[in-house]
Amino acid sequence: MRSRARTHVATLLLSAVLASAALAVGGDPAHARTPSPSPSPSSAFRPPASVDGGAWSSGHLQGTAIDRRRGHMYFSFTNLLVKTDLAGRPIGSVTGLTGHLGDLDFNSADGRVYGSLEYKAAQAFYVAIFDGSRITRMNMDARTTDVLSTVHLREVVRDYTADMNGDGVFDGDTGNTPDHRYGCSGIDGVAFGPGLNGRGGVRLTVAYGVYSNTTRTDNDHQVLLQYDVRDWRKYERPLSEDALHTSGPASPDGKFFAYTGNTTYGVQNLEYDGDSGNWLMAVYKGKKAAFPNYGLYVVDGSKPARRGEVKGQPRPESGRILSLLPRGLHHEPSGVYGYESGGQYGLVSLDDGRYYVAEAGTVDSGGTTLQTGRAVLHRWTGAVPNPFAVRGPAG
């Protein structure tokens, strides 16, 4: 990992420039400027208005990530990773994934792409780590090339397989059960950002998927795990789907809860915004009538997690509770704040008030349905119900 001193100096030198640029853009007072622990983008970086991820015989678009220095965009299509340049020209792809590849984020410290990878039938959950510099051609097999390594997440397995009703039977991949602690269906959202406990340092944050279930009360939080990945190379193993490994940290460095109400499969896309210091959680809407069921929730990064009640659990439980940003739409009965917006298929902050919000679709090609994806440049306005506005590359 690059030295913390170099990162700190870079952040200090660029923070004033970023703040001035952000003030020129304007926006919601909730978009409070706080220093980012991540290296700031170069002022010379001019993002295109959109980046086309192509059309593929694959699963639908799950997430996106950008390597600004090299000018590359990465698209996760469930069982396929696609690498393009910023003009949308394909550079390479990774195939051979039979698990569920979800959200992505780029780690500027080691130049690699991190994503969530699930094998629910095998009760195995991983962080997939792609070496983008080695993705140089199309259709590179994840199992037989050296582009991918994986780290096992034991904490997720424990919560996913929890026998909550004590009948001695794990009911498997279904939401129609009291099993799965917190309603855990696996993992999806991933993002790099500061420690949620307010102690600083860059962490990889992994968000749970959460089954939709309107009959239980213990599934109304978004659950976020944080990991310090600086020593993860000792855990990394190649992907072998015939013999899934369990090499990984015994527990996370932190476990946090955000009270939003139940959603449909939890945080689809998680993103840290270095401009505001906040965390964005894009979700598929929930179905509980007691909650507003927004599509986007924002964790207030200015407030460290506090010890409090994890509501609705079978037995009283305390945990590290995160605060939602008190802006946007407000549902008074539940106390939940949020917005209505996209981002469920990909969300990338450029740390200056601009975001790439992904769009997913389909196209017919000779009778075959292909999945498409496109990252579209937006700016944060803080308006309700949708806080994003489409923005071209120039302003």
Task: Outline where the language-model segments fall.
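Secretory targeting and sorting signals
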Residues: M1-R33
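Beta-strand-rich domains and repeat architectures in extracellular enzymes and scaffolds
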Residues: A49-N79, H100-D103, G195
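Residue-level signature of beta-propeller blades and closely related beta-rich strand-turn architectures
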Residues: N79, E118-K120, S133, L153, ...
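Beta-propeller blade signature
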Residues: A124-R143, T217-S240, P292-P314, T369-A394
